[in-house]
Amino acid sequence: MAEMFKVESPHVRYLKDVIEADYSYDTTQVYEEKGVTKVKPCSTKFTFHTERKVPKLGVMLVGWGGNNGTTVTAAVLANRLGLSWMTKTGKKVANYYGSLFQSSTVCLGRGSSGEVFVPFRDLLPMVNPNDLVFDGWDISSLNLADAMFRAEVLDWQLQEQLRPYMEKMKPRPSIYIPEFIAANQEDRADHTIHGTKAEQVQKIREDIQDFKRTSGVDKVIVLWTANTERFCDIIPGVNDTADNLLKAIENGLEVSPSTMFAVASILEGCAFINGSPQNTFVPGAIELAIRHNVFIGGDDFKSGQTKIKSVLMDFLVSAGLKPVSIVSYNHLGNNDGKNLSAPQQFRSKEISKSNVVDDMVQSNPILYGPNEKPDHCVVIKYVPYVGDSKRAMDEYTSEIMMGGANTIVLHNTCEDSLLASPIFLDLVLLTELCQRITFRTETDQEFQTFHSVLSILSFLCKAPLVPAGTPVVNAFFRQRNCIENILRACLGLSPQNHMMLEHKMQRSFVSLKRPSVDCNAYPISSKKGNGVNGFHPPGISNGLSHSNGLGKTVISSDIEIEN
């Protein structure tokens, strides 16, 4: 895939195989010294390498025959084929609305006519979702065309066009251990792998190998979109270390199907993403991923109600309002809702949906004291009639000035699988991109990859999995900015800080006239005609930093900034 633009900078080099970028990572260290809070700006020099060649990517879905699996497969096929269909409201055309990379934009910089926006996907060379190759497993034997019909998600005219393609697709048998999911799933389980746990893991590994061999893909990413499981206890000697987990599988001890799939994927060198709320990544699974330098990510796709919660809570707390009560009610009628009607499976979902507000509460000690947080209640009910059209109702009550109260009530109708499917694509595309990014600091001898626990995926997950000791961030825009700014760093570009100082001065320090360099040499395909790259004269960056020459600046009597 050719780059849609090029960065003209002595700090960025477009080599044959990689984009090499020098980047200054600026942070702020805060510490206490003799009763004074000191603030010290810090800068670390990085060099990023991003491989330019985009691989042929295979995606294996656990639960391929479910609502999500059939919908995302159908969506990719429909986009690849350029399908359109009629509904009662008119003609519809296949698209990827809801995908961060395919349907949202980022500000590249400023040009002669203002800010220049490009599709998120064009920042770095990325896999085109139309080129994805799908395979997977399911405990149900239906081919994907019949499973798509059972799901009742897509319009009938579209299903008719897709049937000739999808009826040829049939999931591989999957692992079924009844005690981990609701008993009401038994009637689907006619397509299972038999044998010991060790034999089942070996069969999954053989399936991955077979898919690689027969499809000709360069990489495989495995994604769990099957039923929500109950939580597993962390048991010393069973799943607390990588070696104990492997022994537990050999000895047939308690290991969940999702963890078994994760182990098989890791041993095959394939990234594994958990799209459900259960604790798939027990300590032993995380250690195994780190040992094999394989990416893992999760947990639980963030699509509807929880995504809104991560935005609204961020808004309320950032505005200085104090949310004191959050009540979230859902009812849905798809198989996910059916499985979640069992108490143990619901508990897994309740935990992932409840923790989404924690970091925003902890960010404001003015509003919340130690151990104080809003009352937070989550309810999910199964109502078969509504199918995949999930209803979500939320009530947010906040304390406002002088003892007042503010209540916000939302009603949200979520087409569950149509919201989740674009997130699948973003997860696998971002994971694959991260596999092609390496970096080092000025003191490192060798380049390194991201940590095996791929926390950059947090934007797409309800309960972000992060490396030990890492802060968990749920706030929507902080998560999105993290992805955008890391990708900008790979191009040697400063983070977007939205200061726009050049427009806030009587005498601007930067000329907004067209630069002498022909910026139109790099047209942006998403716009009519030629676009321009954002222009910054030499020596000027988005982040403006200078010293007053005194060595330190005193902000107040007890806070100092050291330059």
Curated annotation (Swiss-Prot):
GO terms for molecular function: inositol-3-phosphate synthase activity. InterPro entries: Myo-inos-1-P_Synthase, Myo-inos-1-P_Synthase_GAPDH, NAD(P)-bd_dom_sf. PANTHER family: MYO-INOSITOL-1 PHOSPHATE SYNTHASE. Keywords: Cytoplasm, Inositol biosynthesis, Isomerase, Lipid biosynthesis, Lipid metabolism, NAD, Phospholipid biosynthesis, Phospholipid metabolism. It is found in: Cytoplasm. Belongs to the myo-inositol 1-phosphate synthase family. Its EC number is 5.5.1.4. Pfam families: Inos-1-P_synth, NAD_binding_5. GO terms for cellular component: cytoplasm. GO terms for biological process: inositol biosynthetic process; phospholipid biosynthetic process. The keyword Transit peptide does not apply. The gene is isyna1-b. Coiled coil: none annotated. Its cofactor is NAD(+). Pathway: Polyol metabolism; myo-inositol biosynthesis; myo-inositol from D-glucose 6-phosphate: step 1/2. It catalyses: D-glucose 6-phosphate = 1D-myo-inositol 3-phosphate. It comes from the Eukaryota. It is an enzyme of class 5 (isomerase). It comes from Xenopus laevis (African clawed frog). This is Inositol-3-phosphate synthase 1-B. The keyword NAD applies. The lineage of its organism: Eukaryota, Metazoa, Chordata, Craniata, Vertebrata.
